[in-house]
């Protein structure tokens, strides 16, 4: 399990809680921030390069030898053929240059230029350097199939693209991880509402949430208006960030203030060892 201690430093533990080593990723002077994905004894990630503003760069880090490459090998995503691309200029709410992509199979992906997208298929981890966020179509979310994107108009620095059937109210999944059987995701609705965009996504029309999609049963459980995965035990903190360990285990990460709150509210004798 890798726990972020600083922007470029991670503490590595085994599942018994034993400290193993400290992992140092590319320095803070190079990367303002990074989003890391651990799989197959490698760390994958990307970060904003300080001296180039919002330019993002992807890198791979082999564990535990520490061999770092400044960019990931580009592998074509499995069964994904691009049909068309639409660009949203200056969409600060999305972190800069933002694109929407329509694939031949009817699915849509969207994300920032060179953010580094990861897709697991056929036992391999695929990387694509253009689009990271995914618009999913799942049973239970009651979404209409996106047909085509077109330019709707501009407002200040924002340009707005929508589908023929209107993207407002649909789900955008900015974080997606899966363990082969389930997909864990956070989601937002109303992110294509222009009023919401210009108010930095703080309006009530933008609703966050999270959910779990069971690939085997095609069942979706969505928890709206809350980005935390609820813990089944009363009083226990909820998971707010999730990731996968290098050997495929699902790991929930908790906010520090929620851990402190749980320690204060749960009797010591009832607290699990990891909470103590």
Where are these regions (language model features)?
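Eukaryotic scaffold repeat domains enriched in small/polar residues
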Residues: 1-276
């Amino acid at each position: 399990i890798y726990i972020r201690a600083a922007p470029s430093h991670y503490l590595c533990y085994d599942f018994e809680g034993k400290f193993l080593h400290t992992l140092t990723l590319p320095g803070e002077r190079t990367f303002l921030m990074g989003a890391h994905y651990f799989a197959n004894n490698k760390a994958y990630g990307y970060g904003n390069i300080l001296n180039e503003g919002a330019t993002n760069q992807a890198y791979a880090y082999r564990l535990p030898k520490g061999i770092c490459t400044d960019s990931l090998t580009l592998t074509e995503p499995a069964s994904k053929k691009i049909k068309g691309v639409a660009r949203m200029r200056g969409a600060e709410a999305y972190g800069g240059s933002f694109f929407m992509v329509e694939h031949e199979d009817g699915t849509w992906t969207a994300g920032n230029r060179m953010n580094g997208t990861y897709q697991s298929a056929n036992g391999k981890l695929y990387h694509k350097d253009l689009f990271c966020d995914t618009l999913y179509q799942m049973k239970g979310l009651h979404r209409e199939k996106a047909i085509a994107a077109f330019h709707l108009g501009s407002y200040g620095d924002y340009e707005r693209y929508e589908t023929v059937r209107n993207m407002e109210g649909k789900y955008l999944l900015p974080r997606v991880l899966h363990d082969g059987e389930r997909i864990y995701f956070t989601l937002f609705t109303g992110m294509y509402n222009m009023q919401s965009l210009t108010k930095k996504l703080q309006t009530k029309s933008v609703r966050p949430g999270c959910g779990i999609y069971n690939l085997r049963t095609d069942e979706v459980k969505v928890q709206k208006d809350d980005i935390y995965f609820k813990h089944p035990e009363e009083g226990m903190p909820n998971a707010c960030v999730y990731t996968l360990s290098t050997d495929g285990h699902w790991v929930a990460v908790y906010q520090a203030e929620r851990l402190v709150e749980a320690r204060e509210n749960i009797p010591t004798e009832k607290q699990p060892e990891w909470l103590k």
